[in-house]
Amino acid sequence: MENDILNEELNDTATFTPTDDERFAEKAIIKVIGVGGGGGNAVNYMYKQQIPLVRYVVLNTDKQALGTMDVPDKIILGYDITQGQGAGNNPEVGRQCAEASVDDIKKLFDKDTEMVFITAGMGGGTGTGAAPVVAKLAKDAGMLTIGIVTVPFQFESEQKILTALDGAKEMQQYVDALLVINNENLTTLYPDISLFNCFEKADDTLANAARSISEIISEKCFINVDFQDVKTTLKDSGTAIISSGEGEGENRVTKAIENALKSPLLKAHDIKTSKRLLMKFSCARECENPITAKELNEITVFTSSLPKTVKVKWGIADIPEMEDRIKVTILASGFDVTLRDGEDKGDGPITFSSEDNAQKSKKPEKPDTDKEAAIETTYGTGTMKQMALNR
């Protein structure tokens, strides 16, 4: 079939043999799979970072987009359906294309793979429709399966936002943990970002989330956190978040933690409502001011402020380039989430809010109110009014 020929042209993904690129570990226990345009761009960005223990794969219905990727391992989805022309922003077409390529996708989940990241931008056709199919196949194969997805900027239209939230809800059914990055929060982080750069920044943010978790596993720690700690934190955990922050000078450990927790990317979550918390501190052993035992008390002060229901594990990695700075990466999981109306278990987008926010949600009196609640919970009060003004 022509689909097989195209796969061979892009890469011999049908057998998933190692490529000639020797930058990565021979036994890669982590696979990072980018689905669709946004997911593919994020994985292409990660591929250039040379993270050990990781292999990368990009999947798309768009042959031309795949051709621009540096990642050697590629699968074109559903060629017989779209002839490589993309899903046309139709998630149903994206789903059908993934289902038509199930045999190729299954071959990605070999015996050496222990953890799979699936990255996608929600709201379009391929990412929204195909990513949940890929996630289900990974989970069914026994992989620790993590979804990392973005939802659109506010200016991208109400319909695209609702499509994205539907896709995220579908994705959540088939992963151990789902990290949702709201692109609109990037406008707080980068208030002067140009329209031409905002989508690139969204792809970078998607990549950084997957990279941060991968680095927890791959970087050697002298107070250890490892793959099993990540697995314990994320296995069947529902919704998760990841953030990082840096500190320097006096109270640098506390500053790093505070900066991580102040990230707009954590906007909808209170760390105290999580069930598991994994923290990795990165600092230089050989520097002018190496971390002291006294500074570790700053970690204890923070962890002691959390409810006893939050299970905490932390470690320290020696990263020479940090010099006198300290960086913390925080991975938290097990947040209580609610469907958009708080009760209905039927079809519809999910909102990703902490238990505190969930208690404030009310069942809508009409379907349109349900949609409005989904958007307002995810994007903030007043969003619908602002979107109406922008029309």
Model regions: which residues?
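Tubulin/FtsZ superfamily GTPase core signature
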Residues: 1-391
